A protein has these predicted regions:
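Collagenous Gly-X-Y triple-helix signature in extracellular proteins
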Residues: 1-210
Length: 210
């Protein structure tokens, strides 16, 4: 079913608690197809699935490589949201983590990730028009995510983390509830929304490079 999809389509892949009712089990995750390159799809969760800190230590300079958010995405989320067969479709990608474009705050070392938050560069590419910011950038928070310490707008949307540094090393960029990226960022210990991103190989099972 994934081979025929186009950029901008939505697909269902994996499952995660979203409706706030754990007794009925996790709900299928809906993803937006941000890109399609050589039989591989870049997926971004359509909704804010969780509220989490980027890192738990206030005012500690931290990059994506050593962040709590990266550990959670590639640990508990990856292992819990996808079946073994689905995990076989998820590519391990080599992410370059560029410095902040204005202040030069360090983006840290390159990382090999199965699941990741989008970068400043990716936000520029995929949220480059008002339509993209409203259609893709502004993300509704799931009932589960909104039940925590997440600030949710009147429209039901929430701020969500990128992985790139903000003005300082203890701040991280995010996309606000209206879909507009914030270069200056927010302190890493704040509870912001999480929208996992990943590449899947729709040509077959197994790892590779994009």
């Amino acid at each position: 079913p994934y081979r025929s999809v186009s950029k901008g389509d939505t697909v269902s892949f994996g499952s995660y608690e979203q409706d706030g009712n754990t007794s009925n089990g996790p709900e299928p995750i809906t993803w937006i197809v941000l890109d399609k390159i050589d039989g591989q799809l870049l997926l971004l969760s359509a909704d804010v699935l969780e509220a989490r800190q980027y890192h738990h230590v206030p005012f500690e300079e931290v990059t994506w490589e050593n962040s709590d958010l990266r550990a959670w995405m590639n640990g508990n989320f990856y292992e819990g949201a996808f079946t073994p067969v689905q995990r076989g479709l998820i590519e391990t990608v080599h992410n370059e983590n560029a410095d902040q474009s204005i202040t030069g705050a360090s983006g840290g070392a390159a990382t090999d990730d199965r699941v990741f938050a989008l970068s400043e560069t990716e936000s520029v590419i995929y949220l480059n028009t008002p339509a993209a910011r409203s259609d893709i950038g502004a993300a509704p928070a799931s009932v589960h995510a909104a039940a925590g310490p997440l600030s949710v707008s009147e429209d039901g949307t929430a701020d969500w983390w990128l992985r790139s540094p903000g003005t300082y090393g203890f701040a991280t960029q995010f996309v606000d509830a209206t879909g507009v990226p914030s270069l200056s960022g927010a302190n890493v210990d704040l509870q912001y929304g999480v929208r996992p991103a990943l590449w899947i190989n729709v040509e077959g099972i197994g790892e590779g490079s994009r």
